[in-house]
Amino acid sequence: MSKVKSITRESWILSTFPEWGSWLNEEIEQEQVAPGTFAMWWLGCTGIWLKSEGGANVCVDFWCGTGKQSHGNPFMKQGHQMQRMAGVKKLQPNLRTTPFVLDPFAIRQIDAVLATHDHNDHIDVNVAAAVMQNCADDVPFIGPKTCVDLWIGWGVPKERCIVVKPGDVVKVKDIEIHALDAFDRTALITLPADQKAAGVLPDGMDDRAVNYLFKTPGGTLYHSGDSHYSNYYAKHGNEHQIDVALGSYGENPRGITDKMTSADILRMGEALNAKVVIPFHHDIWSNFQADPQEIRVLWEMKKDRLKYGFKPFIWQVGGKFTWPLDKDNFEYHYPRGFDDCFTIEPDLPFKSFL
């Protein structure tokens, strides 16, 4: 049979998806984290893989889903949090713009799965299934109550789940995970479609969302989930030593406040007394597309006058950041290769060919 007749949509998908195959899985497994450091990889959106010098592997908010895929229904889901926020009716054109850089079903070495909150782009049934099927049978699933309710509903045994709220501490090998207050006001209006938010005092944030501080022997990482800007970042900065902070950044559409702005990211870094602040989430949704260089430009304008003690870092999805080795870098670039050029004799017609 000819190739053009044997190839199907399904064979095409299986041969090209996930786009990075197991490349990043292999890179993470092979990484030997040096003493006095920690390594992390950006998985897209707010997904992070963190690896410590003791070999602890944890993933946070690893999501393997997609956004809008069809114009079929021109209207937003009734009761959606964005509809509540802005009184809109039209479909939100949020298409996923980031490739899938990690294969959940190729994960073998993992010590904990974490989620900051239960929004669809921060917790994933495919990740849960892959870990349950292919990894050790004692890997815990850690998150606030709403996340644990989801995991249990998907079939994760209750005894594998750990509910955390601000103030709780969980130890995973040599990583101490501190659950802290979250400031995700969008989470408070994520309600059942038939439930009204107008005129009703929101229920507590603690069951819905948490921020995390990961204390490793090589440094600390602050993961803010989908939190908006809050004065309480300064409280967290007073109470904890924070090396690297991650903040959800994006260009909010008209009538919407769901992501931190460039100014908010700088305020967050300053309030937390962080050494490095890294924006994320701006990569994933087409309608929240934002240029992180804006953060760096604003930082350059303010850093001397306000005596900033932190630097911004512009990352790329799938890229690695190692603390403290990368603390003075401003931007990530994927490995360029060809470092072994001229280790063998080139095969060219003549030397001046190129």
Curated annotation (Swiss-Prot):
GO terms for biological process: L-ascorbic acid catabolic process. GO terms for molecular function: L-ascorbate 6-phosphate lactonase activity; manganese ion binding. It holds the Pfam family Lactamase_B_2. Induction: Induced by L-ascorbate. Repressed by UlaR. Gene3D superfamilies: Ribonuclease Z/Hydroxyacylglutathione hydrolase-like (3.60.15.10). Keywords: Cytoplasm, Hydrolase. SUPFAM superfamilies: Metallo-hydrolase/oxidoreductase (SSF56281). GO terms for cellular component: cytoplasm. It is an enzyme of class 3 (hydrolase). It comes from the Bacteria. It is found in: Cytoplasm. PANTHER family: L-ASCORBATE-6-PHOSPHATE LACTONASE ULAG-RELATED, UPF0173 METAL-DEPENDENT HYDROLASE MJ1163-RELATED. NCBIfam families: PRK11709.1. Probably catalyzes the hydrolysis of L-ascorbate-6-P into 3-keto-L-gulonate-6-P. Is essential for L-ascorbate utilization under anaerobic conditions. This is Probable L-ascorbate-6-phosphate lactonase UlaG. It comes from Escherichia coli O127:H6 (strain E2348/69 / EPEC). The lineage of its organism: Bacteria, Pseudomonadati, Pseudomonadota, Gammaproteobacteria, Enterobacterales. The gene is ulaG.
